[in-house]
């Protein structure tokens, strides 16, 4: 782990550190109080730093949300790790390679024709990406936080990656926060594969949500199906929440506006 820089966020105590694990960039923030919870976030470019975010100066404001919610609950704030995707001019589809569930497509799931030129099964790298997170990044930054107190969060492709990670690594974290999961990549077949791969209910918690504007406007039929399948599997009550946010879109500003709710869903348990 090589440190690149440190920077501060208004209203957030301490520094955010930017480090490198091989070619993978990571931003992370540790609260001044000893953290007992850990949040792992995809698309780390958008978590803390408005100068690196997809939409200029639009971030998740994740540390601010964590501080608000933890103070209201009377607990120490969680540590937050933001893992950058690898998209660049040289690797224009790097984000998709990192986040799209590799095993499903390697085993024959057919991608929607609109994405066939982008998603090539043998080029997907999500398994290697997740291995780096769990075997290198987390042990180096937050080695003493229990998996039972660890959550993962992502939006769009990051939402898919979060659910995939829970199915593939259920012993590594116990709460999945999937905002605006991008089901249209493969439609109901992707929904079925994802839900059937999740661990048996009883120990894990799952949050899913979407808006009604932009890309999110197409998600409702798939999410309704996902909700039905998940409840059929036995996820219910405090273990599963699915929300629709009217007039909410597909961008960091929209997700940040309601982030306190999934944050509380996780931390209040």
Spans of features found by a protein language model:
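Non-catalytic cap/lid and distal C-terminal segments of serine-dependent acyl enzymes
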Residues: 1-269
């Amino acid at each position: 782990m090589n440190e690149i820089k440190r920077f501060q966020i208004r209203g957030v105590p301490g520094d955010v550190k930017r480090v490198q694990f091989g070619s993978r960039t990571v931003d992370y923030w540790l609260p001044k109080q000893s953290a007992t919870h850990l949040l792992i976030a995809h698309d780390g470019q958008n978590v803390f730093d408005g100068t690196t975010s997809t939409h200029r100066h639009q971030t998740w404001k994740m540390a601010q949300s964590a501080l608000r919610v933890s103070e209201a609950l009377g607990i120490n704030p969680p540590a937050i790790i933001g893992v950058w995707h690898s998209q660049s001019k040289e690797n224009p589809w790097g984000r998709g390679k990192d986040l799209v569930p590799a095993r499903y497509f390697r085993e024959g799931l057919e991608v929607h024709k609109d994405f066939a030129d982008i998603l090539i099964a043998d080029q997907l790298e999500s398994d290697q990406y997740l291995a780096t997170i769990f075997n290198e990044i987390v042990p180096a930054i937050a080695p003493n936080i229990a998996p039972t107190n660890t959550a993962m969060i992502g939006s769009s492709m990051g939402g898919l990656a979060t659910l995939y990670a829970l199915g593939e690594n259920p012993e590594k974290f116990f709460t999945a926060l999937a905002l605006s999961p991008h089901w249209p990549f493969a439609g109901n077949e992707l929904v079925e594969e994802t839900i059937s791969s999740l661990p048996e209910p009883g120990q894990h918690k799952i949050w899913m949500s979407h808006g009604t504007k932009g890309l999110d406007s197409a998600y409702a039929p798939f999410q309704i199906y996902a909700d039905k399948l998940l409840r059929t599997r036995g996820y219910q009550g405090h273990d599963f929440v699915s929300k629709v946010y009217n007039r909410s879109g597909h961008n960091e500003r929209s997700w940040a506006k309601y982030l306190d709710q999934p944050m509380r869903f996780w931390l209040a348990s």
